[in-house]
């Protein structure tokens, strides 16, 4: 068996960074760059009733998070080839669903379709590949990484002329530019939303922020089944749905949560996060982007990882395992970091 050539990690990282910068920017202004990007995938793929669709995969499993333009009164179905997997409702109205497919063939493209309870198509079929088996020897693996794609709609009219966050249309174009390089997977490294509930500067330190007052959350209540549910969707939805749409339907995504995903800035005193904001973070994940699928070498009993009829999904610990070529461990520590003399980032069970 031929040996793989030795790869110097420093040279690899330096070369990768240079190639990424040249490929993405080439010295061009942002507006000129985005104007050259191809027609959005959603314009050549019939999304039907689908508002947004984000998948993740392992070698034998697929997990989808999907929202629809209207509530569905009965559970839709995900068809993977000739097999069917029922949807599970993630909200209380029937607009947000998840689909979990198991025991799939590894390393092959699968034909997927979403159908309503009456058998009608909810969108055009598409393909999504599972990862190669752990003993496979793939020749290449390309990973797209980015961070801080959230934020309410802003305005951009040219270099030095940005107000607030970038418009969601430009964020979407940048991500589609990344997708044009054909990544095998994508890591969204936190800050998918910016809607901090407290102020952490000046005389208002610790007081409710203007955005918190706008949302008018009931901090003593549950997220789902109350006005809190609608307030969450009004705050988070416009920061996620138009940025991703269904453009990542054929690219597995891995979403880590950072400080702003817990509806707070990581200023001193803000963490460990308050119970209600922790529930908001969990609910946002439940609605919009997939948790991490099981992996045989991941220890059981990690924080925010559970055994259920969906297997050992984790909200905070993930693995990208691409044959024997790439293994990427993903750890989210925002929920376990503490302050004080005995402060830690990782829960003792993780240590």
Model-identified regions with their sequence ranges:
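Sec-dependent, cleavable N-terminal signal peptides
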Residues: 18, 23-24, 29
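N-terminal secretory signal peptides and thylakoid transit peptides that target proteins
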Residues: 2-20
């Amino acid at each position: 068996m031929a040996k793989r050539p030795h790869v110097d990690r420093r040279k690899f990282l330096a070369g990768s960074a240079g190639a990424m910068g040249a490929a993405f920017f080439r010295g061009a202004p942002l507006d000129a760059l985005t104007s050259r990007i191809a027609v959005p995938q959603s314009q050549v793929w019939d999304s039907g009733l689908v508002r947004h669709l984000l998948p993740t995969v392992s070698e034998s499993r697929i997990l989808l998070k999907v929202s629809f333009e209207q509530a569905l009164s009965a559970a839709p179905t995900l068809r993977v080839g000739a097999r069917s997997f029922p949807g599970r409702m993630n909200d209380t109205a029937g607009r947000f669903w998840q689909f979990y497919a198991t025991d799939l063939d590894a390393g092959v493209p699968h034909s997927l379709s979403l159908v309503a309870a009456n058998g009608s198509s909810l969108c055009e079929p598409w393909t999504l590949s599972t990862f190669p088996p752990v003993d496979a020897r793939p020749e290449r693996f390309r990973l797209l990484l980015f961070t801080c794609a959230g934020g309410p709609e802003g305005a951009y009219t040219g270099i030095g002329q940005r107000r607030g966050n970038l418009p969601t249309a430009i964020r979407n174009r940048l991500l589609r530019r990344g997708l044009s390089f054909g990544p095998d997977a994508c890591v969204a490294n936190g800050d998918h939303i910016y809607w901090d509930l407290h102020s952490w500067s000046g005389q208002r330190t610790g007081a409710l922020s203007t955005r918190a007052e706008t949302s008018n959350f009931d901090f003593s209540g549950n997220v789902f089944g109350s006005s809190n549910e609608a307030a969450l969707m009004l705050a988070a939805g416009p920061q996620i749905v138009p940025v991703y749409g269904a453009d990542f339907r054929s690219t597995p995504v891995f979403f880590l949560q950072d400080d702003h995903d817990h509806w707070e800035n990581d200023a001193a005193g803000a963490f460990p996060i308050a119970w209600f904001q922790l529930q908001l973070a969990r609910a946002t994940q439940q609605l919009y982007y997939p948790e991490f699928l099981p992996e045989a070498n991941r220890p059981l009993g990690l924080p925010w990882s559970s055994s259920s009829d969906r297997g050992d999904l984790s909200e905070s610990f993930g693995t990208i395992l691409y044959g024997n070529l790439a293994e990427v461990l993903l750890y989210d520590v925002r929920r376990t970091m503490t302050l004080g003399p005995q402060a830690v980032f990782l829960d003792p069970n993780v240590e």
